[in-house]
Amino acid sequence: MGKITSIEVQKRNVNRVNVYVDEAFTFACDAELIYKQGIQKDSVIDVEAIKEIVKEDEFIKCKNSALRTVEKTYKTEKELRDKLTEKGFEEDTIKRAIEFLKEYNLLNDEKYAEMYIKDRLRSQGRNKIKYALIRKGVSEDILLDKLSNIDTEDENDTAFKLAEKKYNILKKKESDKYKLSQKLFRFLLSKGYDYDCCNSIVRRLTNNEYME
């Protein structure tokens, strides 16, 4: 047990305070916690209460860090967890912060996948999109659901437009039709389109049957 002898607002951050017990600096925390916990000068505090305050303060810092992160750019749960881990927060604290954001729909992998797919379909095929979302930690169930909604005809039309633009650039530099076809095919594959789609488009643009 000890007696709180001083509570001082920090000079560099007015939202945080330094708490002194028996004239010695003991801990710093968010000013909000002082009011929530009913802490005031001359009150008595024990070690367990201090530990609880420090733990809650860590959660507030983690939560605020998470909020700042998603304000800058939308994240998947895995991406946010990795960011918070890099900053040194404990797993239990990170879990609480993530649950807080999910409660207010500020973290939603399903919504993220929808937005990501809609944006990337303008320049990528479903295979590249799929593997990118896997790396971002989106679950298989969400992936299967969202990728199944992609309109194959629209995807193929986009692939053709990209290939046509690339073809017009390549044909100025490559006179060998076979090599040109190979380069165009690899270009489409790198964009995430499947074999049949790539083959069909290359044949349409070059009249080259080598893929068959």
Swiss-Prot record:
Domain of life assignment: Bacteria
Cellular component, GO, one term: cytoplasm
Single GO biological process annotation from the record: regulation of DNA repair
Alphabetized Gene3D superfamilies for the sequence: Winged helix-like DNA-binding domain superfamily/Winged helix DNA-binding domain
Location(s), subcellular: Cytoplasm
Keywords: Cytoplasm
Principal subcellular localisation of the protein: cytoplasm
HAMAP family the UniProt entry points to: RecX
Protein purpose: Modulates RecA activity.
Family designation: Belongs to the RecX family.
NCBIfam families per the UniProt record, alphabetical: PRK00117.4-1
Protein name (database record): Regulatory protein RecX
Organism: Clostridium perfringens (strain ATCC 13124 / DSM 756 / JCM 1290 / NCIMB 6125 / NCTC 8237 / Type A)
